[in-house]
Structures are given as structure tokens and as C-alpha cells.
Amino acid sequence: MAINFENAPLIEVIVELRWGAALPFPPQGLSNAPTHLFNVNLEASQHEEFFMNFGAECGSRGLQRAERIVPQGFPVIPGQVVYRFRSNDRSLQNLLQVGPGVFTVNGLPPYKGWPSFEAFMGRGIDALLASRPLNETENDFSSVNIRFINGFGKDYFEDTSRLAFLKSLGFIVQVPKELEAVSQEDNSTFFNMNYITNLKGGAKLQVTVAEGVKEGVPIQVVELGTTHESVRPTKKDLLEIINISHDLIEKIFMDMTAPIHSKMKPKEV
């Protein structure tokens, strides 16, 4: 049986696909050249056709609420989100985002579990693959990134310090003796961490620990993510990579948070 948590710390799940140019357009330092201004307009026209095709594919899948993030006529650079698409059912919070060279699936609370999110993501991937320009359909995605962003509120560390809470998750902070001798650890003591390591098979695992704020209340952010490079542009290949990443992240999260599961209020579903 799967386990969900009534007091889950999850803030957002993000699956991001990238392709094409990795550098902003136009090139740095050449913005005054008339030829590059023309290129920007031409590029924008090509992007708009892709956006319209993607929007039509989303609409046919029940995602007809569109929101443009970048105003019409403004320059758009590779990797910048331009449109968001949501379900007609306003009770569903998940959304798709698209821009030149970037596509994301965003899962927001109330998170109904991976199978539900995976089904929504599959619809988004179908829409993306059906709307890619013909000259790009065989090109690999340069990267596939999945991130689980968790925010632990003060109810998780109200009886202890932030550092003690992080230690309960397995994060051990070791500072030089000179700093330890003059410091006084209390609720104002914190640390930020960005840990990146390689995984078997060539992917990367990233763990980020940082302070954050949610609805005006301080939280402890713990983000787990993976990145795979050069992924074949098929739904089968994409879902396989994403599911492998999900399973790894879920195992790390469940093992890491085992000491505080009682506060997360687990329930079988």
C-alpha cells in the first residue's frame, strides 16, 4: 500500500524538459546591431507558431485556461517560460508551462500522489511532442530535470532549533573549532547547502537546504532533484527517466524523514 501524509511538507513538484539553444538570444554585447534585432523578431514569430500549436494540443486535452507570462511583443530568450496552461476544472492546481526550449509540468498542493501527477504529466508530454516543429521532432532533449521542493514549517522545529531539526534528517554541520568556540547555537542559527553528485548512469543528484518563507511564515526548505542529459524525444523514454528519478527521490525522502514521520501524519491509501 502507498503512503501519503496529511501534514506533507511538499510545496511543489517540477518536471522540466529543455532543448535547443543554451544561450540567451540575441548574443550578449550585440543587442544594438540591426541584423540581430531582425533575428529576434523572426525567432519570436517562429516561437509564436509553436506556442499556438501547443495551446491547441492542450485545449484538445482539457487544458484550455491559458495565461501569457511575457507580454506580447516583448523579446523572449531561450529557456524563458511564456505561457501557462491549466485544466478547465478549477479544483485542479497542476499546470503546464512552455517557452522557447523549455517545458515544465508543475504539481501543486493538494498533491494527490504520483500516479495522478504522472497521468497529468503524460497529457502534457503528448501535447509537447505533437506540437514540436518538424525540424526538432528527432532532436534529443538536452536535459530532463525533476525536483521535489519541500518546506517544513515551524511545527516541525518549534521544540528545537533549526540545526537540530536538520540533524534529525541526517544533515550534520561541522564548523571549525574556532567558530564553534565563539558561536552560540539558537533558533537564529541556520545554514544553506547545495550538494551535487553524480549517479550511476550519468545523471546528477542535487540536494538544496535553505531558509524560505511560505505565506509569510519561515520554513526550512529541503529540495531533492535529479538531472538527466540527452534524452530521446519519445514519451516512453521520457517517462522511464522521470519515473526512475521519482523512485530514487522518494526513497531518499522517506528514509531521510523517517524520524519525523509521526509529525507528517502518515496514512495508507
Place the predicted regions along the sequence by residue:
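Hydrophobic alpha-helical segments and helix pairs
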Residues: F85-L129
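N-terminal low-complexity, intrinsically disordered segments
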Residues: M1-V98
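Surface-exposed beta-loop interaction hotspot
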Residues: W114-E118, G122-G153
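Short, flexible loop/turn elements at secondary-structure junctions
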Residues: W19, P109, F148-F152
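Solvent-exposed, flexible loop/coil segments flanking beta-strands in beta-rich domains
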Residues: M1-I3, I149, K267-E268
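Aromatic/basic-lined ligand-recognition segments
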Residues: G79-S91, L95, D140-T226
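Long, compositionally biased interface segments
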Residues: V217-V269
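Conserved aromatic-histidine-acidic binding/catalytic patches
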Residues: I3, V105, P109-S116, P233, ...
